[in-house]
């Protein structure tokens, strides 16, 4: 990881657990307090009226009932640990929140819809690994995986599913982050290549 992240239960990043709890707590509490959904969900009309915070707060509640809540929280539980091991705590949080911000803006301005859930931010966090995969380890498996992710995101866009933009924006965020702040292994490899006789 680029930034040190405290681990618990072996190789499980504490920051990933905290992220899951921050999202899961209000989502589960929503079963006892249904009014939380109306209070935090994304509503383009209310957002245009000045309640801009709904773009971000909508990630902490779920609009898919029990099945949707379980699916979203399970997906986050699978995605967050490896993502935070890869990116570190600060960058992992940044990617999740930026993914939610972009998804919220798109579903407010481009694909106006009322809703809630962490699916967009989770997909962006997962897709960010595609951006780093090709740049750090440009081998066939990474290239194929990135191509599948990008094509999948583009396909969702063509059927007017805003989650496609979450996938594509996540991949772009990952590529931008690894380009601006490359991991040490990438720096070392580039330095080694520059010192080869063929490069001199």
Language-model region placement:
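C-terminal transmembrane module of polytopic alpha-helical membrane proteins
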Residues: 1-9, 153-200
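Aromatic-enriched alpha-helical transmembrane segments of multi-pass intramembrane proteins
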Residues: 6-21, 50-54, 137-160, 191-198
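N-terminal TM1-TM2 helical hairpin plus the immediately adjacent luminal interfacial "cap"
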Residues: 11, 16-94, 109-115
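Aromatic-anchored segments of alpha-helical transmembrane domains
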Residues: 23-30, 99-108, 146-159
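Alpha-helical transmembrane segments in multi-pass membrane proteins
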Residues: 76, 95-99, 103, 166, ...
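Membrane-helix interface "capping/anchor" motifs
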Residues: 84-92, 129-143
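Alpha-helical transmembrane segments and their membrane-interface exit regions
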Residues: 103, 124-132, 169-180
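Membrane-interface micro-motifs in multi-pass membrane enzymes
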Residues: 111-132, 162
């Amino acid at each position: 990881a680029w930034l040190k992240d405290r681990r618990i239960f072996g190789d499980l990043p504490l920051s990933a657990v905290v992220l899951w709890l921050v999202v899961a707590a209000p989502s589960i509490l929503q079963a006892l307090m249904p009014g939380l959904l109306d209070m935090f969900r994304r509503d383009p009309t209310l957002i245009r009226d000045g309640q801009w915070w709904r773009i971000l707060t909508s990630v902490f509640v779920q609009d898919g009932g029990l099945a949707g809540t379980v699916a979203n929280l399970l997906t986050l539980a699978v995605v967050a640990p490896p993502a935070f091991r890869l990116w570190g705590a600060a960058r992992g949080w940044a990617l999740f929140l930026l993914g939610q911000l972009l998804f919220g803006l798109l579903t407010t301005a481009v694909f106006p819809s009322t809703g809630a859930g962490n699916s967009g931010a989770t997909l962006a966090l997962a897709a960010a690994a595609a951006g780093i995969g090709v740049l750090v380890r440009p081998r066939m498996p990474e290239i194929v995986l990135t191509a599948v992710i990008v094509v999948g995101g583009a396909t969702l866009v063509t059927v007017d599913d805003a989650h496609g933009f979450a996938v594509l924006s996540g991949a772009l965020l990952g590529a931008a982050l690894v380009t601006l702040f490359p991991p040490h292994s990438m720096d070392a490899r580039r330095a080694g290549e520059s010192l080869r006789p063929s490069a001199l």
